[in-house]
């Protein structure tokens, strides 16, 4: 896929790979610098950025120990623009992880507000593990009690967007049935487009 030259900067989440286990020459041969922030637990979580433009600065994590141990946030500076690549926690495994997700969201919200004071031009992209509106999920009624579409999670995104963040996809595309994730257990899910839009590229209004 990278050989098709899809973009100058690519942000990936849930890489599940340790940096030392990756053959970096394959990316470098295609003209990409590659940066990885991995979870301490092998085969879990992690984020990576592939870029044809060398960043001015790289920030690993947010100084939140549990989040950083899970390799959830990688940040790169290009001039006066900062890109934040984030893999939000999922709460689907149980109540304990759902509670962790709420705590992570609150702390990350505070972190972003502080970061904007230093970097007015911010790009936040990643797997948020939250579908925002009913248009962003194939069965809103059937999933109203599902992690990823809970009222508290959607309210977090309401509050987030009320802080002058722009949902770049919805800025250009208002049509329904546009999703970014489909369950893998049954092929019919993707064939019938029963998906969720849980991946976002958001920018501050300064951009």
Q: Where are each of the predicted segments found?
A:
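Surface-exposed cleft-lining segments at the edges of enzyme active sites
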Residues: 63-64, 88-105, 141-146
């Amino acid at each position: 896929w990278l050989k098709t030259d899809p973009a100058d900067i690519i942000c990936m989440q849930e890489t599940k790979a340790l940096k030392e286990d990756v053959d970096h020459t394959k990316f470098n041969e295609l003209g990409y610098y590659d940066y990885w922030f991995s979870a301490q637990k092998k085969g879990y979580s992690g984020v990576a950025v592939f870029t044809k433009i060398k960043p001015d600065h790289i920030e690993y994590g947010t100084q939140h120990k549990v989040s950083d141990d899970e390799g959830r946030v990688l940040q790169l500076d290009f001039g006066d623009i900062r890109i934040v690549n984030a893999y939000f926690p999922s709460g689907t495994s149980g109540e304990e992880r759902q509670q962790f997700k709420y705590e992570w969201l609150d702390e990350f919200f505070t972190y972003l507000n502080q970061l904007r004071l230093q970097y007015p031009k911010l790009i936040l992209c990643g797997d948020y593990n939250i579908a925002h509106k009913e248009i962003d999920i194939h069965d809103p009624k059937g999933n109203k009690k599902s992690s990823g579409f809970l009222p508290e999670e959607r309210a977090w995104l309401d509050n987030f967007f009320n802080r002058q963040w722009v949902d770049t996809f919805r800025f250009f595309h208002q049509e329904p049935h546009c999703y970014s994730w489909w369950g893998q257990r049954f092929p019919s899910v993707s064939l019938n487009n029963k998906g969720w839009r849980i991946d976002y590229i958001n920018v501050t209004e300064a951009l």
